[in-house]
Amino acid sequence: MNMSYLFFFFFIQLVLKYINSKVTENTICKDGFLIQMSNHFECNCNPGFVLTSESTCENKVECNANSLDKRCGDFSKCAYKDLQQKELTCKCIDGYDLEESICVPNECKNFRCESGKCVLDPKQEAKIPMCSCFIGIVPSKENNNTCTIEGQTECTLKCTKENETCKKTSGIYKCDCKDGYTFDKEENACISFSLFNILNLSIIFIISLIYFYII
């Protein structure tokens, strides 16, 4: 076996390990952001992006003649609707099944969690389905570990940017700007409302001056 083949083999193994790696509080979500529920972490994508793996987002496309195999939704791609290959539709990728318009792991098909969602146990190498609850709810041992009782989950997200903190939003934890600050896309940072308002007023003033002199 020559060295180039060995190198290629190990490179492929590293890529597969990265793609299939579990999402933790240390995961960096490409073109997305990390959230936490009661029993797991996951990446959510920025607007206009969809999940292609547990930690990677890509541009979302509409299925048409030029978008075969491209990503049209989380864990889904554009594929031919039938064997006649005349029409493309958005289908779940291998390993996922469609349930209530969402592509879920095969093992989570028909797996009910009540106030939460089915995920694959991040502590197991095998694909074992389990419930992860919305923040404020925890699994109940009396009810097959479904999300049915109130309970607290500590936020362990690493919100390290300046003026950033962990916040509960719509049943999840995520890193967000502290009270009194707002996120500025151009600066990619949380800035104070007062500074944000000053910048906006300055822009409005400059535009008004330009408009005045043109007219």
UniProtKB/Swiss-Prot annotation:
Signal sequence interval, chain numbering: 1-16
Disulphide bridges, residue numbers: C63-C78, C72-C90, C92-C103, C108-C118, C113-C131, C133-C147, C155-C166, C159-C175, C177-C190
Record membrane topology: Lipid-anchor; GPI-anchor
Primary localization class, coarse: membrane
Sorted UniProt keywords: Cell membrane, Disulfide bond, EGF-like domain, Glycoprotein, GPI-anchor, Lipoprotein, Malaria, Membrane, Repeat, Signal
Prosequence residues removed at maturation: 193-215
Annotated protein name in UniProt: 25 kDa ookinete surface antigen
Organism of origin: Plasmodium gallinaceum
